[in-house]
């Protein structure tokens, strides 16, 4: 608060400071209203020493799609590893619940490319379409892949007018009936930073 009170009103860091204050308020509230919860690691079958995140679970709970920065088994992703962060590009994997209710060994989705970032966003209610973040354009946009002939097809850019732009679009979620799509963008005209937008499919 001291920084906000004494900084130039045009400072770009004011919004960051205000967000940090709001986060502190949330943290205090949660600490004062603790709930008994148990968090379980999915174990070595799913997790590795590299980063795994952005899980999206199917409606029936039988499939888990997630983003991982693990290296490819054939080492073809090695030339694209970030030497500073020791990160490999993002890829999407899926694991399924087997007959004894444990997770199967994750499989990389067919459309992933070793040199690009493809990250999980969400999965449609019928699990026939997966929405993907892809940075092939340089700015980061929303793509999708449809399930056909027993596999996910090559990704396609989401072409509905008003979604992808020259700005950064990172996430989207579609209602079960497919009518409404909510997405995140840092385009000009919002409240600042990344904002949530909605488009509606017309009859």
Question: Model features per residue range: what roles?
Answer:
Residues 2-203:
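Short, conserved micro-motifs composed of acidic
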